[in-house]
Regions:
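Active-site-proximal helix-loop-helix substrate-binding element of RNase H-like nuclease domains
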Residues: 154-182, 303, 343-487, 497, ...
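C-terminal polymerase-core module
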Residues: 529-536, 540-592, 759-807, 811, ...
Length: 894
């Protein structure tokens, strides 16, 4: 078999990848989707072809001989998107780092370079594959030159291959004749005029018959069809120019030797650094069999399973000695239904896997882990997702609270989240890549779909790697993460908010919230009855029964049978999304019923029926509170999501009635009043807004007076309602369109409201504009506590993406600060309840609201604790107000 050369049309493949891969950015906000897609295509062809040589050709921005010959050449092309343009030099740099030859030549296009290299190489007996999305290159096909055109559909890349026979089968002409076909038909993408009115089929038919333009010109009188005859006859010089522009040159004067473009050594230290920089996580695995990172054989060498009791004792004793000082240990805990094994890293050469076995029982491991934790107070224990394992260290308690210092731990997952809150994962594999420049096999790669219990018996070697790698990664990256947090001024956020919060959330999960099962059943029945009534009313209005939950069937009923306006039909049918139906609802009662039917059906399936599966044997729901999910810093809840309970509709509110305190207790519910507006007043420094809050004015009435220019006592309810919508809309970067939808007014009126608002509060306008400009400059926003949110969209050339980024830039500092403040309040309340040795417990947080299950004889004390803890969480230029209520169920307390 002869030698092989792959030639790649750089701009063509990069452009194709840019539009075929969703927008991606790295931590610095650099767009990377085109590079990522390019590399995927590159690796596909490298795997298939296994070439001896590889070269990539790029166009230069300088004019070529074609531009000089024809001023209009490519004159209709739109400018390259900035996000793509940014990636062109980066792609070249990356290719060079991979030791792939990159060729450019002033005055010529990449096609000419590819043609020249291909023909010269083929003449030497080298088999050439040209990879491009440009069919112009079909003219280069011969027995030794294959044109490969990749096409990506639904994420799957398929390749069309063309030798001369394939070109003939498609167009009925030879590759050389294909130039003449293009000269006749022209090319709108390159602004090559051709013969006006002559399309691909006619051009192909003419060249099939006459085989060359010269022969066509000699037989003008007999050309068919008549329109083509006229056009060609009248545009001979233009057609000749089009042929000149269409023909790829194969004699470009370039300094190139195919022998210097050998394929190999793609995965080296230089390319690794760039792959890591651009966050090409999946591709980093390609470096595993190199000397650059492999799988860190040095640490693998020191992985050791120990089950001898005396040896285990020695490891724990040494761990206590280290944890009691200032050095760190790495700790990974493996547990599904029960504790299975522990990974402990004491140093670079002491990495242990300790399974539950023989005398090393589950309770023994828990006791010894508690011993280690009890002596640590300098964030000596590096681990991840500590909240999931705190119950293991509960050997000693006071009033139900574990005697574990939060300063014992550094949670590497939470620390990494603060640095990059938009990342998908913060596991050991991600930490290794991000902070250690190491690529580790993932848990899935090591264990597949095996449970831990099965892995103990069926894949213990890989289980040992998984457990040891985890503890080793936590141990190795802890100091580096700490250093980065300090460099980014986020360590205080980590130290004073996120780490203490772990213990608060753990206690909330342990406590759970009690559910009145009978009330839940009754609620489900009420919903079921209402849904049945609505169902009948909808069928009656429609004149037939149909599946209301089927968008396709519903669309036909609404827009065809009932003839409602503005129905937009797609391939799958009419859109029946909520925003479409909400516009129809005021004029069509049946649509209002459909919207209500949907809302009640969701309430029934998600809450009335769905909550039952989460009720534990103790009659309580023990949900999970997450610290590393939202980009804004807000806590999220899952299994179930109690933060998403709808409260705008009465039946949605009613679900809160099923949540009840235990006997002898009541609920105290405290909710911050307008916290985000108060934060806006503080951060913007707007004197009018600050004065309004400091004088305890009705802020929405005060805003209405300012915006509408009326005395405070003459503000109407409608003006107040509109001002309220503007107040909150400003925080969320609401546009005039959004406000018009919210208030059911015209966009013009909404625009006037916003303009009046900013005219009344110019400092707020300046502040918000500053947030946007800062985010554009830095690529991220910051809260008062230096919580960072990356906003790559804000630099997008796409209007919709850029507008989204600007709205995020306006809102994230305010919403993120509110999230930080409620977290501080939670810590305050938790600590005060603990210090007062009370039986009352903080059990739930929903956005700006805290719920405490309060012993009846502790109500007054807890009320004061909640008010103090929330009001004094932070000192602002305006007071923080808290609405506090008491109730025998959550609805009554809210």
């Amino acid at each position: 078999m002869g030698e092989k050369l792959i030639l790649i049309d750089g701009h063509s493949i990069l452009n194709r990848a840019f539009y075929g891969v969703p927008d991606l950015t790295n931590a610095e906000g650099i767009h990377t989707n085109a590079m990522y897609g390019f590399l995927n295509i590159l690796f596909k062809f490298l795997d298939e072809e296994k070439p001896d040589y590889i070269t990539v050709a790029f166009d230069l921005s300088a004019p070529t001989f074609r531009h000089k010959a024809f001023d209009g050449y490519k004159g209709t092309r739109k400018p390259m998107q900035p996000e793509l343009k940014q990636q062109v030099p980066l792609m070249k740099e990356l290719l060079k780092a991979m030791n792939i030859t990159v060729v450019e030549q002033e005055g010529y296009e990449a096609d000419d370079i590819l043609g020249t290299i291909a023909k010269e190489s083929a003449a030497k007996g080298i088999d050439v594959s040209i990879v491009s999305g440009d069919r112009d290159l079909l003219q280069l096909a011969d027995e030794h030159i294959k044109i490969r055109i990749p096409k990506t559909k639904k994420g799957v890349t398929e390749v069309e291959d063309y030798y001369p026979s394939d070109v003939f089968n498609l167009y009925g002409v030879t590759p050389h004749e294909f130039i003449d076909v293009k000269a006749l038909m022209g090319d709108t993408s390159d602004n090559i005029p051709g013969a006006p009115g002559v399309g691909p089929k006619t051009a192909s038919a003419i060249i099939q018959k006459y085989h060359s333009l010269d022969n066509v010109f000699e037989h003008l009188c007999e050309l068919k069809p008549p329109k083509a005859k006229t056009s060609i006859t009248e545009n001979i010089e233009q057609i000749k120019m089009s042929r000149f522009l269409s023909e790829i040159k194969i004699n470009v004067p370039i300094d190139y030797k195919v022998e210097d473009s050998k394929a190999g050594d793609f995965f080296n230290e230089n390319s690794y650094e760039l792959f890591k920089k651009y966050n090409f996580k999946n591709m980093l695995k390609k470096f595993e069999n190199t000397d650059i990172i492999a799988k860190d054989p040095e640490c693998y060498e020191y992985f050791k399973k120990i089950s001898d009791f005396a040896e285990v004792e020695n490891v724990f004793n040494k761990a206590m000695d280290i944890a009691g000082g200032i050095e760190k240990i790495g700790l990974s805990i493996v547990r599904e239904s029960e504790l299975t094994a522990v990974g402990i890293t004491l140093s670079d050469t002491e990495i242990y896997y300790i399974p539950v076995s023989g005398f090393v029982t589950e309770s023994y491991l828990a006791d010894r882990l508690s011993d280690v934790v009890s002596v640590a107070s300098n964030r000596n224990i590096a681990s991840a997702n500590i909240k999931d394992y705190l119950d293991i260290f509960e050997k000693d308690k006071i009033n139900g609270y574990p005697l574990v210092s939060e300063k014992a731990f550094i949670d590497t997952a939470i620390a990494a989240y603060l640095l990059h809150p938009s990342n998908e994962s913060y596991d050991y594999e991600s930490l290794g890549r991000e902070f250690l420049s190491l690529t580790y096999p993932s848990k899935t790669e090591l264990l597949g779909k095996l449970s831990i219990k099965k892995a103990v018996n069926e894949a213990e070697d890989n289980l040992i790697k998984y457990v040891c790698l985890s503890s080793y990664a936590y141990y190795k990256c802890a100091d580096k993460i700490t250093e980065q947090l300090k460099n980014e001024n986020m360590y205080e956020l980590f130290e004073t908010i996120e780490m203490p919060l772990i213990f608060v959330l753990f206690e909330m999960q342990q406590q759970g919230i009690s559910v009145d099962k009978q009330a839940l059943v009754d609620y489900s029945k009420v919903l079921g009855t209402k849904i049945s009534v609505l169902e009948k009313e909808i069928y009656e209005a429609a004149g037939e029964e149909f599946n209301i939950n089927s968008p396709k069937q519903l669309g036909v009923i609404l827009f065809e049978k009932l003839g409602m306006p503005n129905g937009k039909k797609t391939k799958s049918g009419y859109s029946t999304a909520a925003d479409v139906l909400e516009k129809l609802a005021p004029d069509y009662p049946v649509v209002s019923k459909i919207l209500e039917y949907r809302q009640l059906s969701k309430l029934k399936s998600t809450y009335a029926d769905g909550l039952t599966q989460y009720i534990s044997e103790d009659g309580r729901i023990h949900g999970t509170f997450n610290q590393t999910i939202t980009a804004t810093g807000r806590i999220s809840s899952t299994e179930p999501n109690l933060q998403n309970i709808p409260i705008r509709m009465e039946m949605g509110k009613a679900i809160r009635k099923v949540f009840v305190p235990k006997n002898g207790f009541v609920f105290l519910d405290a909710d911050y009043s307008q916290i985000e507006l108060r934060i806006l007043a503080h951060m913007s420094g707007d004197e009018k807004l600050i004065e309004a809050y400091n004088s305890s004015a009705d802020i929405h009435r005060a805003t209405a007076a300012q915006v509408f220019g009326v005395p405070l006592d003459e503000v109407t309810d409608e003006q107040r309602r509109n001002a309220k919508a503007v107040n909150f809309g400003i925080i969320y970067g609401m546009s005039s369109f959004g406000l018009s939808q919210d208030l059911s007014i015209s966009r013009k009126e909404a625009k006037e409201y916003i303009e009046r608002y900013f005219a009344s509060y110019p400092t707020i306008k300046t502040f918000i504009d500053g947030l946007v400009s800062d985010a554009k400059e830095k690529g991220y926003s910051l809260t008062m506590y230096n919580r960072r949110r990356e906003i790559p969209e804000i630099k997008s050339s796409n209007f919709m993406q850029r507008s989204f980024g600007e709205r995020v830039a306006m809102n994230a500092p305010i919403q993120g600060t509110a999230a930080d403040i409620i977290k501080l309040a939670m810590i305050n309340v938790y600590n005060a309840l603990k210090e007062h040795n009370l039986r009352s417990r903080l059990i739930l947080q929903v956005h700006d609201e805290l719920l405490v299950e309060t012993a009846e004889d502790e109500v007054e004390t807890v009320k004061q604790i909640m008010l103090d803890g929330m009001k004094n969480a932070v000192s602002l230029k305006v007071p923080l107000e808290v609405d506090l209520k008491e109730g025998k169920d959550w609805l009554e307390a809210h």
